[in-house]
Structures are given as C-alpha cells and as structure tokens.
Amino acid sequence: MDSSSCLVDDTNSGGSSTDKLRALAAAAAETAPLERMGSGASAVVDAAEPGAEADSGSGGRVCGGGGGGAGGAGGKLPSSKFKGVVPQPNGRWGAQIYERHQRVWLGTFAGEDDAARAYDVAAQRFRGRDAVTNFRPLAEADPDAAAELRFLATRSKAEVVDMLRKHTYFDELAQSKRTFAASTPSAATTTASLSNGHLSSPRSPFAPAAARDHLFDKTVTPSDVGKLNRLVIPKQHAEKHFPLQLPSAGGESKGVLLNFEDAAGKVWRFRYSYWNSSQSYVLTKGWSRFVKEKGLHAGDVVGFYRSAASAGDDGKLFIDCKLVRSTGAALASPADQPAPSPVKAVRLFGVDLLTAPAPVEQMAGCKRARDLAATTPPQAAAFKKQCIELALV
C-alpha cells in the first residue's frame, strides 16, 4: 500500500511539473520577440524613458506613431557649418556674436548663408580686420571691400547691430558707396577735365532725385502720428503702387518689408500689411521711429516716390516729408505781426499816467482784471488803474 501510494504521488507530481515547464516555455516563446534589440534594423527606444536618444549616426530611427523630423520630440536641431549661426525651431537661422562674454543677437534670417554673412559683418566691426569669418575677409586691395571697411569704421557697433537686425545693412552700404562715389570724382574724369582747362564739380549725391517718379502724397492724421504706431495708406494708392497678395480665406496678411530712402540717404524699413479688421493697408513696424525722428505732426505731408525706369535702380522706393506748421501768432514772422500801439502818458500832479493797457498774460490769473478788460476800453482801463495806484501811494 505504501509503495503504490508513493508511485501515484510521484506520477501526479511529475505530470504537474511537466505542465509547468510547458507553460513557462510557451510564455518565454511569446515574450522573446519583444526583448530583441538591434536585429539588423532600427532600435526601438521607449520615448517615455528619460535620457533615451537614438544614435544620430545610425542608418535610421523608428519612432512610435510616425516619422519624426529634426526638431521632433526628443530630437535636436541640426547644427550649422558656419561660425556664429544657430538654427531656429521655425526653420530659419539666427546669427549671434559674443562681446566681453555677453551674447549679442544679430537677428533672424531666412537662409543659413545670410546669417553667416551677418556674423561676418559683425565680426569685422567688433574684432577688426583679423577677425575669423565664414567667408573671405574684407581686404583693402578690393575696392568694394575697402568701401565696406570704410563704412564699418564710420558706424558704431550698436548701429551695425541695429542695421543687421532690421535687414537694412546692405541697403545703407550701397547708399554709402553711391554717396562716396558721387562726392569723389574719378581720376579719369579729373584728368579729362584738367586737359580741357577746367575742373568740373563732382556730381551731387542727390542728383538721382531728378529721376524719380512721384507716386502719391499722404497728409498724416492725428491717428497716424499717435499711439497706434501705424500709417494708413489710401486704398487706391496701395493697390496701385504697393499691391499685396492677400490670403484667400480672408485672414490677416503678414505683409512684406519695404525699404524707403529719404533725402539724406538713410534707409527706412517698414512692415507693409493689410488689416482685414479695418480693411486698410498700413505701414506698422518702423513707422513710429520715423515719426519721432522727423518730428511729424498731424497735417504734415509724407510723399512717396519710385526711381524712374531710366535710373536703373530696379524700382527703388523713396520717402520724403513736408512739415506744415501753424500760422498762428506764436509762429508768425515779425513782419506779419501788428505793430504795438504807441504808449501815451498824461502828466497829472507830477505823476505820469500811462494809457497803454496791461499785457494779457499779466491778467491771466485775475478774473476781475479779465472782466474789466472785456467791458472797459483799453485807454479808460489803463487810466483807472493808474488812478487807483496813485491813491494807494
């Protein structure tokens, strides 16, 4: 009995052990594919694991739920091959330079090369001609490079940074070259003039102004020079001279940047856009600085011009302003002001009684004096005042 019972127990225990082994083998077979890593394809990395990142040098990368770009979750922006250029999340490129361990931001640019050129300009101004640049450094042997070096030497670091941020550096550089060339006659012209027995005067830097086509004038309103910081362009002129491609959905237009040159050769950069809310074309960014520097007030006239086709400036835009001041007594010329009435005096008991009325500004704080001046003739009022002063003596 004992031996048979032991055999039964061994048989039962052996069967249960076999079942357990089979169950463990099946479980291992099911979980084995999930534990495989690097089987000739891309590795599967848990995105929720902190610090997990695929190798940038691997052939590919699989992210759960779809493909990821360079700026995707857990990814890094591509570095630039240029010095002083940093990528932006929106696909644009930024430029920066360090001055005394402080970062100086030079602006954001559409292309990587444009940002690299902006850095080179700042490096030439901040660190001199020996600065390390991305492209070929400026040299005195090249006339264009020498002109740019001269331009940088006459501008402060803050001015150069401001021009780079507003994307007006190359426009102002071109204007500086034209002005310098106009004020300095060439050697050939000087030699030819001397051979003819006379020296011709250099061409005025503002001579191309005669080759401009007048577009339109705008009389600024109080809101144009107020706190709204915008200039409304009349719709008929805006659609004719500055057409914009408006969004089909009727939304707000981001607009474009327009460069205008004033009479002094300074380049002004304005953002020109369409406001769907007010259905108007406006100049916004940069306009408040123009108003402040030019001293514009309501009633002044701003003129817009474009270079003529024969000038060869490819439709260059110009801006001018005419200040219209009040013709009141405070600003009137001395010839327009009436001559003061002669002062008459009457001598009574050894005292000179003046007949000239008191100035109005002296009576501004006295209501009785103002009422007296309004109801009493000037001579009678002056005589009465003198009599009162005499009685009080």
From Swiss-Prot:
CDD domains: AP2, B3_DNA
GO CC annotation terms, alphabetical: nucleus
Main subcellular location: nucleus
Keyword Transcription: yes
Subcellular location field: Nucleus
Compositional bias annotation for Gly residues: 57-75
Record-level Gene Ontology MF annotations: DNA binding; DNA-binding transcription factor activity
Keywords recorded for this protein, A-Z: DNA-binding, Nucleus, Transcription, Transcription regulation
Residue range(s) of DNA binding per entry: 81-136, 216-327
Region (Disordered): 49-79
Gene3D superfamilies assigned to the protein according to its UniProt record, in alphabetical order: AP2/ERF domain, DNA-binding pseudobarrel domain
PANTHER family, A to Z: AP2_ERF AND B3 DOMAIN-CONTAINING TRANSCRIPTION REPRESSOR RAV2, B3 DOMAIN-CONTAINING TRANSCRIPTION FACTOR ABI3
Name under which the protein is recorded: AP2/ERF and B3 domain-containing protein Os01g0693400
Organism the protein comes from: Oryza sativa subsp. japonica (Rice)
